[in-house]
Curated annotation (Swiss-Prot):
Catalytic function, reaction form: 3-O-(alpha-L-fucosyl)-L-threonyl-[EGF-like domain protein] + UDP-N-acetyl-alpha-D-glucosamine = 3-O-(N-acetyl-beta-D-glucosaminyl-(1->3)-alpha-L-fucosyl)-L-threonyl-[EGF-like domain protein] + UDP + H(+); 3-O-(alpha-L-fucosyl)-L-seryl-[EGF-like domain protein] + UDP-N-acetyl-alpha-D-glucosamine = 3-O-(N-acetyl-beta-D-glucosaminyl-(1->3)-alpha-L-fucosyl)-L-seryl-[EGF-like domain protein] + UDP + H(+)
Cytoplasmic topological domain residue ranges: 1-7
Lumenal side: 28-321
Annotated protein name in UniProt: Beta-1,3-N-acetylglucosaminyltransferase manic fringe
Gene name of this polypeptide: MFNG
Organism: Homo sapiens (Human)
PANTHER family with a match to the protein in the record: FRINGE-RELATED
Topological category with respect to the lipid bilayer: Single-pass type II membrane protein
Assigned protein family: Belongs to the glycosyltransferase 31 family.
Enzyme class of the recorded protein, top EC level: transferase
Keyword Kinase: no
Length: 321
C-alpha cells in the first residue's frame, strides 16, 4: 500500500502536466500570429490623393501673329494663377515670351498656317508633351480662352477615378460624319461627337494612354489626314470610333461661336472657360460691369479676372477695397 501511493500520485501529476501542456499549445495556436490565413493588422489604404491643380496639364495653342495681341493678355490674367501648369505651344520663337515662360513655351516645328495639318501638328505636340509629363489630366484651350482654375478643378474632381473621361462642349447639335478608308478602296461612314477646341476640352490620363496608338508621335497627324478633319474632330474620332468612348458634354466650356452676352454675371465664376471674338460681324464678349471700360478691356478678360481675383495688384477699384 505504501508503495502504490507514490506511484499513483506520480501518475496523477504526470496526467495534470500533460493536460497543462496541451492547453498551452491550444491557446498558442489560436493567437492571431499563429492562426493560418489570418491577415496581419494594417492601416486602411487611403487611396489616390485628391486632385490638385498641379496634377493638370493646360495646353494653350497659339501662333506668331497672336503672341502680342492675345497671349500677353492671358499671361497677365489667368496664366498668372496657373503658371506651373500651363504650357504654350506656338510655331515661332519669341524672346519676350521665352523670358516670361521659360521652358513652358514650346516652339513646335509646325506651320503657322491655319490648316488641318498645321493644327493637328500642334495638337500632336501638346498630346506628346502631356504624356511625357506624367500628369493626371490634359486640358487644351485656344489663345482666346480664359480658364478659371477653380471651376476647372471642381469639374475634374467630380469624375470617378476609374472612368475614361473626355469632357468639353460640342459645337454642333448632332454628331459629325466622316468617311473612314477601308481595304480594297472602300470607305465606311462613321459618326461621332467631338468637343470643339475653341471652347477647350479635357481628357484624363487613363483615356489618353489608350489613345496613344492613334495619337502619339506622327500618328495623330496620320489619323487626322485619314479622316480629313481638323485636330479637335480627330480627338473625338479616336475616342468614340476607335476606343468606343463617349464625349461628356459640359455647358461650362465656352467659345466665341456662342452668344456670350447671355451669361449672367452671377454665373461667370462657375464657368470653366470663356472666350471673346467677332461673331456674325459683331464683337462677342461676356456682359460684365467691371473696373475697366470696354475701350480699356475689349475682351472683358481683365474685368473678369478682377471679379475672380480682386486681390490682383493691377485691379484698380476692387483691389483698393
Amino acid at each position: 500500500m505504501q508503495c502504490r501511493l507514490p506511484r499513483g500520485l506520480a501518475g496523477a501529476l504526470l496526467t495534470l502536466l500533460c493536460m497543462g501542456l496541451l492547453c498551452l499549445r491550444y491557446h498558442l495556436n489560436l493567437s492571431p500570429q499563429r492562426v493560418q490565413g489570418t491577415p496581419e493588422l494594417s492601416q486602411p489604404n487611403p487611396g489616390p490623393p485628391k486632385l490638385q491643380l498641379h496634377d493638370v496639364f493646360i495646353a494653350v495653342k497659339t501662333t506668331r501673329a497672336f503672341h502680342r495681341l492675345r497671349l500677353e493678355l492671358l499671361l497677365d490674367t489667368w496664366v498668372s494663377r496657373t503658371r506651373e501648369q500651363t504650357f504654350v505651344f506656338t510655331d515661332s520663337p519669341d524672346k519676350g515670351l521665352q523670358e516670361r515662360l521659360g521652358s513652358h513655351l514650346v516652339v513646335t516645328n509646325c506651320s503657322a498656317e491655319h490648316s488641318h495639318p498645321a493644327l493637328s501638328c500642334k495638337m500632336a505636340a501638346e498630346f506628346d508633351t502631356f504624356l511625357a509629363s506624367g500628369l493626371r489630366w490634359f486640358c487644351h484651350v485656344d489663345d482666346d480662352n480664359y480658364v478659371n482654375p477653380r471651376a476647372l478643378l471642381q469639374l475634374l474632381r467630380a469624375f470617378p477615378l476609374a472612368r475614361d473621361v473626355y469632357v468639353g462642349r460640342p459645337s454642333l447639335n448632332r454628331p459629325i460624319h466622316a468617311s473612314e478608308p477601308q481595304p480594297h478602296n472602300r470607305t465606311r461612314l462613321v459618326q461621332f461627337w467631338f468637343a470643339t477646341g475653341g471652347a477647350g476640352f479635357c481628357i484624363n490620363r487613363k483615356l489618353a494612354l489608350k489613345m496613344a496608338p492613334w495619337a502619339s508621335g506622327s500618328r495623330f497627324m496620320d489619323t487626322s489626314a485619314l479622316i480629313r478633319l481638323p485636330d479637335d474632330c480627330t480627338m473625338g474620332y479616336i475616342i468614340e470610333c476607335k476606343l468606343g468612348g463617349r464625349l461628356q458634354p459640359s455647358p461650362l466650356f465656352h467659345s466665341h461661336l456662342e452668344t456670350l452676352q447671355l451669361l449672367r454675371t452671377a454665373q461667370l465664376p462657375e464657368q470653366v472657360t470663356l472666350s471673346y471674338g467677332v461673331f456674325e460681324g459683331k464683337l462677342n464678349v461676356i456682359k460684365l460691369q467691371g473696373p475697366f471700360s470696354p475701350e480699356e478691356d475689349p475682351s472683358r478678360f481683365r474685368s473678369l479676372h478682377c471679379l475672380l481675383y480682386p486681390d490682383t495688384p493691377w485691379c484698380p477699384q476692387l483691389g483698393a477695397r
